[in-house]
């Protein structure tokens, strides 16, 4: 039996923690978790899942504004998590995505990534999303892991200043 509240640093209260998560923390979590999620999705996908992912990639290519890019990206990554057929995985991904709606994420994004979207999202990121769909559709879990990792590392490199990647909370392991 535990007496008292858990240490603040370990709190997972869904209403407060996303607001406390920095862009570096969020990207690090995504780089660690999402490749494994993509691998699992490749083993559990069905034709309806693949059709949904193709539609989401097409929607991303048509995104014209920042908000549309963010919505398309979030929908794509959350769809992959749902493909695992695990409510725990899908819920974790939805929770991570919710951090992107908070002020800290928006400020970090504004400082470092704004110049790239939506043009980069329509091209490079959508091409990466398409590659992820192809390998998931093929049922190649290892290739799905690699494609997702490459995609997220590319985002992190564009999103975070190089100095932030090498500091605590940055994405480098």
Model-identified regions with their sequence ranges:
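Charged, glycine/proline-rich intrinsically disordered loops and linkers
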Residues: 108-120
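Conserved amphipathic alpha-helical segments that form helical-bundle/coiled-coil interaction surfaces
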Residues: 26-110, 128-131, 146-155, 162
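Short linear motifs at protein or domain termini
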Residues: 1-39, 43, 164-173
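Short coil/turn segments at secondary-structure junctions
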Residues: 17-21, 60, 64, 116, ...
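Residue-level recognition of short, well-ordered coil/turn positions
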Residues: 65, 140-141
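Residues at secondary-structure transition points
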Residues: 17-24, 28, 67, 71, ...
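C-terminal-biased regions
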Residues: 118-134, 141-173
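Hydrophobic aliphatic residue packing
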Residues: 1-3, 13, 80, 132-136, ...
């Amino acid at each position: 039996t535990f007496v008292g509240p858990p240490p603040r640093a370990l709190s997972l209260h869904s209403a407060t923690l996303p607001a406390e998560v920095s862009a570096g923390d969020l990207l690090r979590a995504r780089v660690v978790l999402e490749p494994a999620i993509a691998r699992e999705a490749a083993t559990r996908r069905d034709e309806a899942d693949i059709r949904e992912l193709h539609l989401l990639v097409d929607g991303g290519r048509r995104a014209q504004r920042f908000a549309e890019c963010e919505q398309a990206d979030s929908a794509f990554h959350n769809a992959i998590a749902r493909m695992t057929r695990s409510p725990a995985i899908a819920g974790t991904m939805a929770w991570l995505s919710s951090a992107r709606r908070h002020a800290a994420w928006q400020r970090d994004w504004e400082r470092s990534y704004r110049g790239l979207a939506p043009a980069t999202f329509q091209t490079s990121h959508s091409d990466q999303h398409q590659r992820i769909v192809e390998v998931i559709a093929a049922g190649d879990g290892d290739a799905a892991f690699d494609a997702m990792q490459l995609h997220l590392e590319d985002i992190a490199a564009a999103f975070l200043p190089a100095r932030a990647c090498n500091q605590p909370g940055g994405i480098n392991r």
